[in-house]
Regions:
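Domain-level signature for proteins that mediate thiol-based redox and metal-cofactor handling
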Residues: 1-122
Length: 122
């Protein structure tokens, strides 16, 4: 499969990959390694503002690249972060995700929503 230049750049560099630790860190995940796609986000939140984001992902290059992009572009008030920094359709176009892989973007979105929900519940 041929990947877009943007997908390859984020896949190879994987900026913000890893975990965050501390009392002000919130974690959410979605998907299943057994099914081929799993994503986890960690958010460090201070005063209701996202200070840092990290991700772990298991899946195809599109999954890893989009997760990296989302973590890199996370920021702002956590109350406004219940949706991805960009919509699933926009991310699909930005990263040239083929139709048969777009379900993976929904897993990324579910992981993001789970993480923000965890932050809002504390």
């Amino acid at each position: 499969m041929k990947y877009s230049e943007l997908t390859l750049r984020y896949f190879e560099a994987a900026p913000d990959a890893g975990v965050l630790l501390g009392p002000d860190v919130y974690r959410g995940a979605a998907g299943s390694r057994a099914q081929g796609t799993w994503v986890q986000f960690d958010l460090q939140v201070s005063g209701g503002i996202i200070q840092a984001a990290r991700f772990l992902a298991f899946g195809c290059p599109h999954t890893i690249a989009v997760s990296a992009w989302v973590a890199e572009h996370a920021g702002g008030p956590v109350c406004c972060g219940a949706t991805l920094p960009e919509g699933v359709q926009d991310l699909s176009e930005r990263f040239a995700v083929p139709a048969e892989k777009r379900g993976r973007l929904l897993i990324i979105e579910d992981a993001w929503v789970a993480t923000v929900t965890a932050a809002l519940q504390r």
